[in-house]
Amino acid sequence: MQKNKGMLPILIVGAVIIIVGLLWLNQDISSKQAENTGVISKQLVELTDENPTFDFWGKNFPEYLDMYLKVEHETPKYTNFGGNLAYSKLIRYPQLTILWAGYPFSLDANEERGHFWIQVDQMDTARNNKDFLNAHGFAKFGGQPAACMNCHSGWTPWLIKNAANGDFTAFNSTKYWTMIKNVPTRNGIEEGSEEHGGPHGGKRMGVTCADCHNPDDMSLRVVRPALINALVDRGYQKDAAQGIKADRKEMRTLVCAQCHVEYYFKPTGEKVKVMGESIASDSSKKWWNGTQKTYDEFEHWRDGNKATEIEVDGINLTFPWSAWKKGEVFRIEMFDEHYDAVRPIFKEDWTHKETKAPMLKIQHPEYEMFSGGVHAANGVSCADCHMPYIKGAGGKKVTQHNVTSPLFDINSACKTCHTQSEEYLKKQIADIQKSVAFDLRSAEYATVSLIFDIKKLREELGKLPAYQSEGKPDDAKISKALAEPLELHRRGQMRG
């Protein structure tokens, strides 16, 4: 009995220690859970997809908004192989004008400036200027479709739901300049004002918080139908809240896969009713070359121009992943397999001006190529490097939302895993990038040589009666004879 009494103080002290420990642990867990919220405004608004503007969502998360908008006012930064200085790639890499001969990218292609500017630059590119295209031999190019807005405008989900009545095909098949006229006004912006045409909640608004976050709890989600459709085809399951069933680590890459991918506009083989413009019936409205305007290349309805209903060939933004199954590492041959399978309905992006090869322009398949890299193999996500954790206000851990090159903050982006010095890492990165760039330039120059060889061969064959019709070179006969080298041009340039 005396022995039990002696144990009582010890038990009491032990219980106190356990209780204090549990309280501390609970506080620490709560702190960890709140680490990524940053500074939260006391003037909270109810977030909704009806107002996806970052200025509105930023009312609740001002620290993140400040990070995101930093790129709007800072001096553009150049890196050896990237950055956000919008230089002309055609001037720096003139071989691209030959590789893309016959395609609008041969006229205008600039380094990207980032998520804030992505819609501004898309609307301002010469590839979206019909008079410019007409004047440079691209009169047959009918202008960009709204499908291009999928990865440039934060208004895309709203426009699919409201302007296209939930019809993804109708959205994609509408003209770009027609669809942009339907962007609504929010945050007190006046219809048709300069702000309504601008990047802050207007028609030039780029990527927004809503593109990656659920308004209910700010968890990660994907909202672009093309990615959801492609992932389901690969073996993923749809999810009402996230778009796709995946854990948070994978979602930190999938949100980027909404746009940083290869894609094409797949014909549906059917006509679809879409929004048109009454300007098409106004015989006084012509392009500079005298042809009839079918849309007004302006972001607002004006001068009596109004919406009509027209019928066009349907297209869908599609990711060519049918041969790439869930859990597999991507291989470039998977693109070959997909494009070969759809060739009866989608032959090419364009016919090369010099070789007449049926070409595919590979866009920006970062997600696909990343899947086979050392970082993906070790469980690293896109956000780990391009949106690293940093110390925010009050020393809290937050995600960097000034999405940029890891080179600008190696300490946060790289040294979490890599223990070497910043100087060593910078040199290592530079060596790898230079090696890849050397191989890429070598492949491009070799392809240019092939183009010149095929062009010369076409000219020589065209002199022979067997490859002529009515005494003139017959391109169809020549292309049939050169089917193998033309196919090698197509596939080789896809890889270079």
Regions found by a protein language model. Give the residues of each.
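Residues within well-ordered beta-strands of beta-sheet-rich folds
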Residues: 147, 208-211, 258
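Primarily the internal scaffold of c-type cytochrome electron-transfer domains
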Residues: 7-14, 23-113, 161-205, 216-384, ...
